[in-house]
Amino acid sequence: MRVALFSPLPPSPTGVADYSRLLLEGLAAKFPVEAYTSGAIDATLDVPCYPWKTFEQRQTVEPKAIPVYQIGNSLHHDFIYSIALRHPGVLVLHDLVLHHSRLAMYMKSPEVVEYRADMGNTTKRDRALEKLSEYTAEVEAAYPLEGTEVAEIAIRMGGGRLLYEYPLHELLVKANKMVLVHSRSARDKLLDSCPGSNVRVVRMGIETPELVSREEARQRLGLGKKTILASFGLVTPEKRISIALRSLRRLLNEGVDVRYILVGGTVPHYDVREEAKQLGIAEHVQLTGRVEEKSFWLYAAAADICLNLRYPTAGETSATLLRLLAAGRAVMVTDQVQALDFPDDALARASLDGDEDGLFCDVMDLLRNPDRRRRLETAAREYIAAEHNPAVMFEDYAECLKEAQDIPSPSIELPSHLS
């Protein structure tokens, strides 16, 4: 059996690229493997790597490869979408909600961008409308009863929370032999939306770093002895940063000498610096921007509590959360369905109800209980070592690929532009 893995790969700035690089190393020990990507080809990969457009030509070689599609809710994955509909294989969903990236692809298309820059041009208007009609056709195919209205609202208003209600994964799921996800909750949601699909859970492999003491990490980063709260990953409203900032203000008002560090890049539509300034706490908030891996581990080691509060979720298993647990950190998450996949002793939970008062109380309770933090840190590292080491991911994938090879290719009706 040959395996053809489609994914963004390093140096693409996405966690799925790092995930796929690790996966390729493990699968190459079990099967002949080749990779397909849209960006620059990393010469350091240990497997053959090709531009994705060459796949159909190479698929004439026997034995034919079983495609493995790594899909997430970002534009880094757009090149995979159409080929995953035409060549059934194994679909790996890193997010259940794909609607944001599909809408963004159409709204950022040359046709739409050119019309927005010259809205009096009727020719450009017609081209933009034709392009957006393809998006509408996708939504209608996934949701025959309400798709037209959903697409219209999304085009006019950007969708917002509506896109979480209409995840737009249905066509991909139904067009492929098997779907892999990383949590039981994601599996259950897929089986609700696409009954009869072959959905399996594979454990996400995480490489465990060498432990660095909190004192050494702070010394290397130039941090002092303040209490440190830290959030990791792209700084977006969905990470509940606003509530964390207001909780930080409460902690400061209670006399806690605390700093909040946000480790990750920022986005144009959310000005966290301005929000901190409006709250009067800007001097207690530090933004690092996107950091290299070694700095990620140092900031994790330096923190007293790591906050991973994303809500709403796109159905993802957070690789960032798993990495923090692998580092043996005390991590607080939003208490929602996705968190049920983790043992109670491996992380702390913050209620989704209420405003910053609830998070303030949860954080203060954990800060006042160093013994509990130490127990969380130990349990977190033990959990990752047992359930998320790379070897178990490689075995899970191998079993699923062998099973998928014998599943007949499904056939579904697609919009004409995707056929």
Task: Give, region by region, the residue ranges found by the protein language model.
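A short helix/loop element that forms part of the nucleotide-sugar donor recognition site in Leloir-type
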Residues: 210-223
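Carbohydrate-associated surface elements
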Residues: 185, 205
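A short, well-ordered alpha-helix in the C-terminal region of glycosyltransferases
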Residues: 372-386, 399
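Conserved donor-binding/catalytic core segment of Leloir-type glycosyltransferases
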Residues: 5, 180, 223-239, 245
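Nucleotide-activated donor-binding/catalytic signature segment of Leloir-type glycosyltransferases, i.e.
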Residues: 272-294
